[in-house]
């Protein structure tokens, strides 16, 4: 949940009485944790395959707790400090590179969609952040929120140390060069792109919608946070649902549906003037992206089961890049046109490109590795 703190606190951090940031600075600030969450997934994915998921998870959580303590005690006194904090929070976002292979390796192929979706439903922390952080900031000041965040971070670390176990599947440690070997396979490029759109869409909206709703409809930070919580809840809960549906009808067919729905919802969100209908459009978009995340990770273990740690890092890096792009496109659009429309339309066009990509690969996937997979693709 701490991964999204800068996003849900952005309205207070960027306020004239605080750091007085421009729209472009605001959206770049919130995109930094997304970008570094993707980059650090590469490192954590490599560590998972070399030293195991459990020690990697413990190490990552200790880094995050140290960063939260520094932000609380020392403070974030300028724009540059928020960017450094965003890099640290990226480690929290990279935790998916630990959780997904650690969970997935306990279960058979035909259950991967549901299992990976449930593991990825940790996105529900975004909802908790959006509901609580703006209210805590209003009551105690936004710097204090980083101190409050230490409490659940320490609690999660303690629970993880007590109950987590390494999966029974033994994985041969990979070298960093294996990333480059894998990246030479064209299917890796496709998975990275598909996840760039689904996860990038979800997390980009999770970080950006608070500022979007406040700017466009003149809401308070608390009101905007409530709407972000509503929209992101369906995305977080939709991930296991999307994975489960993909187990039944196949990930390729599912992604066709989710990309189409997300594209239309983003366009509608950019055009509709009514607050209620606007929220409904982004609720649908977040739900489609969340379910799409589950579908991508239903397919991934079928194709790259033995390299799941590495692939989780690579694909997660693509997802982080997508969120970074969406947040910055919205910021650039707002800065230079006074509207968010252009940024939303550009990302909607990526959904269309993803649909074209699916049509390009589906026959080959179904007749090659999909034909021998132990689950529907």
Task: Indicate where each model-derived feature is located.
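Cytoplasmic helix-loop-helix junction between adjacent transmembrane helices
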Residues: 85-122
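Symmetry-related core transmembrane helices of the 12-TM Major Facilitator Superfamily/SLC fold
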Residues: 144-161, 342-360
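Central cavity-lining transmembrane alpha-helices of secondary-active solute carriers
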Residues: 31-45, 229-241
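C-terminal ends and interior cores of transmembrane alpha-helices
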Residues: 62-76, 261-273
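Helix-loop-helix hairpin linking two adjacent transmembrane segments in secondary transporters
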Residues: 118-164
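Primarily marks hydrophobic transmembrane alpha-helices of the MFS/SLC 12-helix fold
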Residues: 54-57, 255
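C-terminal transmembrane helical hairpin of 12-TM major facilitator-type secondary transporters
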Residues: 249-296
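Extracytoplasmic gate region of multi-pass secondary transporters
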Residues: 6-11, 186-240
């Amino acid at each position: 949940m701490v991964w999204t703190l800068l996003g849900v606190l952005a309205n207070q951090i960027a306020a004239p009485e605080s750091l007085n940031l421009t729209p472009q600075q605001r959206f770049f600030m919130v995109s930094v944790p997304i970008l570094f969450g993707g980059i650090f997934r590469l490192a954590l994915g490599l560590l998972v395959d070399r030293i195991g998921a459990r020690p990697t998870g413990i190490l990552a959580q200790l880094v995050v707790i140290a960063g939260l303590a520094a932000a609380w005690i020392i403070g974030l006194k300028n724009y540059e400090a928020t960017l450094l904090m965003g890099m640290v929070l990226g480690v929290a976002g990279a935790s998916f590179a630990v959780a997904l292979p650690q969970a997935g390796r306990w279960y058979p192929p035909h259950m991967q969609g549901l299992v990976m979706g449930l593991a990825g439903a940790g996105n529900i922390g975004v909802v908790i952040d959006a509901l609580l952080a703006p209210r805590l900031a209003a009551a105690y000041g936004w710097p204090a929120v980083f101190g409050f965040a230490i409490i659940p971070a320490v609690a999660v670390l303690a629970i993880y140390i007590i109950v987590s176990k390494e999966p029974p599947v033994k994985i041969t440690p990979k070298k960093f060069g294996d990333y480059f070997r894998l990246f030479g396979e064209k299917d890796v490029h496709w998975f990275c792109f598909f996840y760039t759109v689904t996860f990038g869409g979800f997390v980009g909206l999770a970080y950006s919608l608070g500022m979007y709703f406040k700017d466009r409809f003149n809401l308070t930070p608390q009101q905007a946070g409530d709407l972000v919580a509503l929209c992101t809840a369906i995305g977080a809960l939709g991930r296991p649902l999307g994975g489960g549906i993909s187990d039944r009808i196949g990930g390729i067919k599912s992604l066709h549906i989710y990309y189409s729905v997300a594209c239309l919802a983003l366009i509608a969100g950019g055009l509709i003037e009514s607050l209620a209908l606007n929220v409904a459009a982004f609720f649908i978009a977040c739900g489609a992206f969340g379910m799409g995340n589950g579908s991508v990770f239903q397919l991934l273990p079928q194709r790259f089961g033995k390299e799941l740690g590495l692939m989780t890092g690579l694909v997660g890096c693509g997802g982080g890049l997508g969120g970074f792009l969406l947040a910055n496109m919205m910021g650039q659009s707002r800065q230079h046109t006074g509207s968010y429309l252009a940024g939303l339309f550009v990302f909607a066009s990526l959904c269309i490109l993803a649909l074209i990509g699916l049509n390009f690969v589906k026959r080959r996937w179904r007749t090659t590795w999909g034909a021998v997979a132990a689950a529907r693709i």
